[in-house]
Amino acid sequence: MILDNGSYAIKSDRTGDAETPNALIRGRDKTVYVGQDLTKCKDYASLVFKRPSEKGQLINWDIQKAVWDNLFYNPQTGVDTDSSLLLTQYPLTLPQVSANIDQVVFEEYGFEQYHRTEAANLVAWSSGQCLDACLVVDAGFNATHVTPVLFGQVHEPGIRRVNVGGKTMTNLLKETVSFRHYNMMDETYIINRVKEKVCFVSQDFDKDLDLAKKTKSLQVEYALPDYKTTKLGYVVDRKQHDISELQTLKLGNERFTMPEILFDPSIIDLQQSGLCETIAESIQASPKEFRSLLCSNIVIVGGCAKLPGFQSRLEKDLRPLIPSEYHMKTRLDDKPDFTTLQGGKVLVDQPGFSNLCVTKQEYDEYGWRLCRQRFQGETFDEDTESA
């Protein structure tokens, strides 16, 4: 089983294109939904999400285990624990958290064979073979990480993070809409849907801002859910819909201001470099002999990367920040939030994959220290551990 354990959603080879929300969700009627059980919800108003991770670290094991239990023991997606597990973890996960993950996998779920790795390592395999060097730009939920991967292994000194992700954009949109239109502060799930449907990355922010002031060419209307004809709402087409009885949000510069904070965090008074400056810093922090290769293999992944205009804006702003003699090339898959999972599928089919894994028998004998050694390359002395 392959598990891309994202901070917003879990992707697995057992669930196809479906995503499992990595959260406990409480409805307005106090019903609690665990992970994929959210599909049973009939009223998406005022949903409250409790997530196991914050700022790129797993902080709540009770929630994470509840979501995993629901996934592993579900009759439709459940797994045979005699099988193997490939699991992703967040960049720069604390060693004790990694050790706890290993313990849960073997002692709680009893998997026979297991490999844990950072998601960026799997992205390096997503093209069908392992790239010698690539730079993974993961625009995720809690934050955006830039990670150099050299010969299939993360180069930790080059990892950089921008503390802006899908969550930040949704919260800003929620506050803006509540100030300008209706009070939507309790409607995180619906506003997140609005963001996904109408927002885009501007290629020239100042120009679009001026255009939005002078004309309505960028304005769209979003019909809010009435829970009779729609549970999540939709973008209004005036030619097809009679809006006289609809409660709608008119969105103009909000459409591109929310994504702009990733490229210019100072908009929300966040004292950090923007995404493209952060990418340039990551490349500069990598070994000199690999910098050109990293520039030519930039892989963009994560849910925020689905926003229209993301790739072209990144290329436009990044080009002046890297040496002119470097060839720059970016890749964005049709489903960038599933690129990591695709890389995992390629890796598990490699003849040497089992050599990367720790078996339950080995874990029972040597414990979590063997996992740390095999997954992260730290020194391990079998004689010392078995003594």
From Swiss-Prot:
A GO term for molecular function: nucleosome binding
Listed GO CC annotations: cytoplasm; cytoskeleton; Swr1 complex
Compartment annotation: Cytoplasm; Cytoplasm, Cytoskeleton; Nucleus
GO biological process: one example: chromatin remodeling
Alphabetical keyword list: Activator, Chromatin regulator, Cytoplasm, Cytoskeleton, Nucleus, Transcription, Transcription regulation
UniProt entry tagged with the keyword Repeat: no
PANTHER family reported in the protein's UniProt record: ACTIN
Function recorded in the entry: Component of the SWR1 complex which mediates the ATP-dependent exchange of histone H2A for the H2A variant HZT1 leading to transcriptional regulation of selected genes by chromatin remodeling. Involved in chromosome stability.
Assembly notes: Component of the SWR1 chromatin remodeling complex.
Similarity remark: Belongs to the actin family. ARP6 subfamily.
Protein name listed in UniProt: Actin-like protein ARP6
Organism: Yarrowia lipolytica (strain CLIB 122 / E 150) (Yeast)
